[in-house]
Amino acid sequence: MARRFGVVAAHGKPEAVELADRIQRWLAAHQCQIANEEALPVVWPELDAIIAIGGDGLIMRVAHHYPDVPILGINVGRVGFLALAEREGWERALHDLVHDRYHVQEGPTLAVQLERGRSVLVDAWAINDVVVRAGYQLIEVELYIDGQFVNTYPGDGMIVATPQGSTAYCMAAGGPVLTAGVHGFAVTPICPHSPIRIALVVPEQATIEQVYVSDREARLIIDGEPVASLERGDLVRVRRGKQAFRLVVLPGTNFYEAFRSKFNFQIRPEAQPSRRTRNADTPSGAR
């Protein structure tokens, strides 16, 4: 049976659109069935994978629209940490894809509800993170884990991040990077007005609740998209989501090498390992 792949490109990047056209011609020449962006809403449940040509934003949008379908990201953005193949190596990546030389890494998602009194104002899910974010003034957020009060955090807000989201806003705010295989979520205060700046890593089974206890402007942000303004007493409840974020992982993918190169994390650029290291095909904690 012919393999079936969807192809989506970032429309704002001419180089991505041009590469998408080349990829579709290549797939057709290798006896694969192709679904372009217009056909995806109908055929997506039948696809072997979706090839997303762009950056991390495009990959997350595709995952939101077509949950549980494996995604191969080809990076034509800047950092592109979720895009595990680079533009220069697209043909080799497709060879591995069509010949089943890959595995699928499943990452957890976040189910989020915003409750105001007895009303549920937001019922959504996130791939990377759920953020309570201040406007221009300090706010206060109460944090509860599994019903137990942790603390009240004065500052700019709070981030709850998945492993794949931990290398995004969470890391920038000083939170931990969670590698794949860590079955937990990072809870990171944003610029807390305190000398104690401690992020938490909680189990995937935990229920994370944030109660907004300020009268100042703040928003609920899901995967970078503002979805609601917050009022005093609002409750943001976060649990593990039902959906899975599925990435196509190609042979030779190495999370730590990608982490060094894409985030310029080389303290000494000339540093080399003193012993042989093995290639790890599983990228831990992709963003």
Swiss-Prot record:
GO terms, molecular function: ATP binding; metal ion binding; NAD binding; NAD+ kinase activity
Membrane-spanning segments: none
Record localization: Cytoplasm
Keyword Ligase: no
UniProt KW keywords: ATP-binding, Cytoplasm, Kinase, NAD, NADP, Nucleotide-binding, Transferase
Protein family membership: Belongs to the NAD kinase family.
Known cofactor(s): a divalent metal cation
Protein name as annotated: NAD kinase
Reaction equations catalysed: NAD(+) + ATP = ADP + NADP(+) + H(+)
Record's function text: Involved in the regulation of the intracellular balance of NAD and NADP, and is a key enzyme in the biosynthesis of NADP. Catalyzes specifically the phosphorylation on 2'-hydroxyl of the adenosine moiety of NAD to yield NADP.
Catalytic center residues: 56
Matches recorded under Pfam families: NAD_kinase, NAD_kinase_C
One annotated Gene Ontology cellular component of this protein: cytoplasm
Disulfide bonds: none
Top-level taxonomic group: Bacteria
Root EC class: transferase
